[in-house]
Amino acid sequence: MNQSIQDINAKAGAEQTNEKELICLNQTLLESVVNGDWLTYSNHCSVDLTCFEAETNGVLAEGLAFHRFYFDLPAAAASEPPTPIQVSMARPHIRWISPDSAVLSYTRLTQKMIAGAAVTASCCETRVWQRIDGTWKHVHVHRS
């Protein structure tokens, strides 16, 4: 198949746009977790989200109920000032499975203050995103 330079550039531009969109969506998802924003989190996730993470003890968790539990935990005492938390992705890498599905892998960095000292925690995450009815949805996560 012969593709013109314009076709190739248009495809590359579309992939770059989709990559930026997915990274932005994933960042919003991560921020919703640290902010306890269930509405944003659940809007970005498929209702049949699956995951492997430390909290599942090696068992595949299916659905949003598992995640909802953590959002519903009581916040810190009101007498304590909120501790700022920053979450970011180091070296995000996207592997396209199809135009409507992608695997996003990165190291998640979480920065916060503990007892007056800045602390950075890291973990490796792989998230699968799928475009469902024209909207990108988070469908699987594996965290270690």
Task: Describe the role of every protein-language-model region.
Residues M1-V47, F52:
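Short, low-complexity N-terminal intrinsically disordered segments enriched in polar/charged residues
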Residues L29, H67-Y70, M89-R95, T107-T110, ...:
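Hydrophobic/aromatic beta-strand elements that line small-molecule binding cavities or substrate pockets
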Residues N2-Q3, T120-S144:
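Short beta-strand edge/turn micro-motifs at domain boundaries
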Residues C45-S46, R108-T110, H142-R143:
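Short beta-strand segments enriched in hydrophobic/aromatic residues
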Residues E19-K20, W38-D100, V119:
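A solvent-exposed, acidic/Ser-Thr-rich amphipathic alpha-helical stretch
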Residues Q111-V119:
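Short, cysteine-centered beta-strand-loop-beta hairpins and adjacent loop/turn segments enriched
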Residues I94-V103, G116-A117, W129-T135:
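A short, structured loop/turn motif at beta-sheet edges
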